Amino acid sequence: MTSLSCIPTRCLAVLVALALTLASSPASPAATAAPADDKKTTRKKARKRASRTVRVYVGTYTKGDSQGIYQFSFDTRTGKAGKVSLAAKTPDPSFLAIHPGGKHLLAVNETSEWDGLKNSGGISSFEIDSKTGRLNLMNQQPTRGAHPCHLVIDRSGKTVLVANYTGGSVIGYSILDDGCLGPSSSFVQHTGSGLLKPRQAAPHAHSINIDPSGQFAVAADLGMDQVLVYRFDPAKGTLLANKPAGPKVVAGAGPRHFSFHPGGRFGYVINEINLTVTAFSWNSKAGTFKEIQTISTLPPGEKQGEGMSTAELRVGVRGRFLFGSNRGHNTIVSYRIDRKTGRLTYVSNYSTGGKTPRNFGLDPSGRFLLAENQDSDTIHVLKIDRKTGKLAETGSVIQVPSPVCVRMLAIDTAK
């Protein structure tokens, strides 16, 4: 640094005079406001980027090339995806759920043995690194039933419910404040069978969901041809069988996944074996369903072919459309929802661009559907016409080994 003694006397006098002039002059409003405005504009742009960018987590089966859970960024305005990377190594994380707080992710481990315990899979809790998206393992618990295939976290974030497919049961675990899995809060073993043996010789709980009121849990059991209803106590995390127990579907239909309409008056189940969707009205006070209709997941007049089955079902972001996936047929079916009656009207079937679309995700904007082709190792991004419900190709294809579930989390880039 140059000292004052090194500055010539004439120059020093000029500098002092200039400093006194600036000190006595009133500050320019534009000059003082500009930095604040610039910061405000920067923050606004950052929030805009954050609101349109999500981090996508992909659950997989790890029998082949997959090592666990993968991640990539996704722009919900353009449909473009970022680079795919491994978020966590873990066995067969076939279904995922993001905690309401956004800091943790839970995954089932769809196995038949867990930590030396036979006839049990596992559930894992991960902490999300907000900067990198990587998942850091917190802890794990056994599910007390083989091949857990679905899970849901209640809106308070204090309980996770899991469906065990081969075990034919559902189990609940408490979630502690630090994101770790606590003690088991409930366990229910299903009993019964269905029409088609050996496929339906035993119960097979394929999904569990919580209704919009937060007071009931609904388990679709493929083996029993039944949608079972439980009273859910969010304070204790317990499940109590409702009376009546829940509706039966057509014998041999095989109910798989369930989706409530956000309005809370209707629910829909996709039937894996006979390729149909059954619509129900929902009484959220009594916890009872009444069937409205059953409709095919194939184009009108087309018959079910060998090797075909359904998989995922989701009500669209704004509650106007319902989407379902057909494996073997390798399409996504779209229906229009009558928001007064709950009835479905067929819109179209659209190719997923690959084989075996086990699952798909809808981005928060409602513009895009991400179809996971399990046997093609691809995720195809399809565009949703938000007026008609029809799908269209975007040309965006993401390579992920054995993808079977996606979950999305907003990336906060605002400072």
Go through the PLM ranges and name each one.
Residues 374-415:
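Blade-level signature of beta-propeller repeat domains, shared across WD40, Kelch, NHL, RCC1
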Residues 65, 90-101, 144-155, 191-215, ...:
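Beta-rich, blade/repeat-based domains predominating
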Residues 72-79, 126-133, 173-183, 230-239, ...:
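Short loop/turn segments immediately following beta-strands, especially the blade-tip
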Residues 45-75:
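An edge-strand/N-cap motif at the start of beta-rich repeat modules
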Residues 133-207:
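Asp-box/WD-like beta-propeller blade repeats and closely related beta-sheet repeat scaffolds
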Residues 82-88, 136-141, 192-198, 242-248, ...:
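A short beta-strand motif characteristic of beta-propeller blades
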Residues 62-65, 110-115, 166-169, 224-226, ...:
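Short glycine/acidic-enriched loop and turn motifs that connect beta-strands
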